[in-house]
């Protein structure tokens, strides 16, 4: 079976639930495949997802993770968090936390993360420094929606100014090697290259 057709069952179920809930912010399948690949590069890793939605992105991450890896996924909206807890309850490697991501990141004092996937605006834009400070040396910062589209709903998607500012600034992060992938919704992948993670 071609790799592009290997969609995890959990992702299929979560995508169906997203349609039922009229939720249109889930990770696209090409983004999901990249998440799975990157998760597989972190055996025994500590992963963080910011913006669970109803569990589509988490499903892809879990499919790439080995048995020793662990995922914390944060969702600010109580209803979506509850759906995700139900969707992901069968996998002991994941913990769904209903919380404001910025507040959670500020309070977090545990080990640094080997991969952080950000699918929420404030931790990606205004509070990016806080998010990056929680990444271990060699760890990955991944986010999507870095190519602005006029088709985006301004009520739920970032403005063109925010996206353009992100693209202009991200290559200036001194402790990271950065790649912007201009396919799908636009993907940023950055790797921490220094041992000083500010933690």
What does each model-found stretch correspond to?
Residues 1-115, 122-142, 146-199:
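A short alpha-helical cap/connector motif
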